[in-house]
Amino acid sequence: MTMMEKLRLRRSARKDSLRLENLVYQYYFSLVPKVFDIDEEVTVCKKIIDKDGNIIAGCTGYIYSWAGMYIDDMWVDEKYRRQGLGSAAFQAVEKVAEERGCHVIWLGTWDFQAKPYYLKHGYTVFSTLYECPVGHEDYELYKRLDKEHTGRKPQPIGFEVVDGSEEDVDYICEQLDGYNKKHLNDKHDYIKINRKLVNKDGKVVAAIMAGVTEVDVGWIWKLWVDEEYRGQGLGTLLVKHFEKKAKEKGATKIISEEIFDWNIDFFKKNNYSVAGELKDFPNGRSMYYVYKDL
């Protein structure tokens, strides 16, 4: 009986996904120790409110254990745009990253969003994904905080920038999603395609966390194989299974981030191309964005 005949492919439950994330990061941190002693990413939210307490601008980011920040969302109410509010909230989040000791910030933006804006703030493009989704380009940009960098100086705006709550993070995300929907054609809800391989004793020996977004882009979020079972093709089997299912659901492209120099060769062997490389994150290593057209 072959190895594959001894294993069963099953759908993953939520508890499986949480365990998968923990196992992936345990492995990562065994290779590259944490810089910040935090168990989960630290959420940073800055907002600007009007006299009635309504949020009119906001920016959110996440600080990671390897001394980096990912800026997730930035939004300004349409009535208040081009008045410096976005820059004020954005720079307030950047300031937190600097004060916490982060050495790099990175972020993503589509072609209809704010690439020129980020370039003016001293960011550099390191990854470009074409037709992602179809008809659009996706950019990833970065700024080093441990080296000299350029950017706009803060300007007076007539409003105070204050800390936001978790509820404010959700609100800012919802508002940005509403803006994005004016430019993107959602085809369906997000489709989870999380799978696991289980041995005869019921032990999970490999798993993938993946899915197809509303705009028909497939994402591989996490992939893990138990050390005892590595080198036997289980990771490739899960990736191929996901690719097949994603294509059946309408995906035209598969992308993945959080690919590092210790696992990039696996993706290259499975015919993924490198869209971009963020050097020296984590320190002394590289993070990659990869893709495959279906």
Segments predicted by a language model, with ranges:
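Conserved N-terminal entry element of GNAT/NAT acetyltransferase domains
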Residues: 1-15, 143-165
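Active-site rim helix/loop that mediates acceptor-substrate recognition in acyltransferases
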Residues: 21-52, 60, 170-204, 209
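Conserved beta-strand in the GNAT
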Residues: 54-62, 68-75, 203-211, 217-224
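A generic structural motif
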Residues: 62, 132, 211-212, 281
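A short, internal acetyl-CoA/4′-phosphopantetheine-binding micro-motif in the GNAT/acyltransferase core
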Residues: 74-82, 223-231
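Conserved acetyl-CoA-binding loop-helix of GNAT-fold acetyltransferases
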Residues: 82-95, 120, 231-244, 269
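Conserved GNAT acetyl-CoA-binding A-motif
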Residues: 97-111, 246-259
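Conserved catalytic-core motifs of GNAT/GCN5-like acyltransferases
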Residues: 106-108, 119, 124-142, 255-257, ...
